[in-house]
């Protein structure tokens, strides 16, 4: 099974998402949002091809259905690298993944 690795930017994205939701819906509900996102990412371990193809070469995108986020990812050397976790309105050309 592939090992999930969050890039520093993906971890920073999660922190920002938590901070945003904490201010809007409270700490516990913000934590529930993050838990839901992480559970969706775990699904990729079993089904790494389930994300849609991206315009970025060698990258797929997991579209989160419960919350308005997209998680671009790629498989590299036995790792499932989560590159970012971004609002669905952000365009791939604006994504800084490195």
Name these PLM-found stretches.
Residues 1-34:
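Arg/Lys-rich, positively charged N-terminal/basic patches that mediate binding to nucleic acids
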Residues 6, 14, 41-44, 80-86:
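Generic leucine side-chain signal with a strong bias for well-ordered alpha-helical environments
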Residues 16, 20, 43, 47-50:
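Amphipathic, soluble alpha-helical interaction motifs
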Residues 32, 55, 59, 90-96:
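Solvent-exposed interaction patches of small proteins and small membrane subunits
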Residues 38-39, 46-79:
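Basic/aromatic recognition patch in beta-strand/loop cores that engages polyanionic ligands
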Residues 69-70, 74-98:
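Enriched for short, Lys/Arg-rich terminal
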């Amino acid at each position: 099974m592939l090992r999930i690795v969050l890039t520093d930017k993906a971890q920073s994205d999660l922190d920002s998402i938590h901070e945003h939701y904490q201010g809007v819906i409270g700490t516990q509900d913000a934590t529930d949002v993050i838990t839901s996102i992480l559970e969706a990412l775990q699904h990729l371990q079993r089904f790494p091809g389930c994300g849609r193809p991206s315009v970025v070469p060698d990258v797929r995108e997991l579209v989160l259905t419960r919350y308005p986020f997209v998680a671009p990812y790629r498989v590299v050397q036995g790792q499932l690298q989560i590159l970012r976790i971004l609002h669905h309105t952000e365009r791939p050309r604006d994504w800084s993944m490195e």
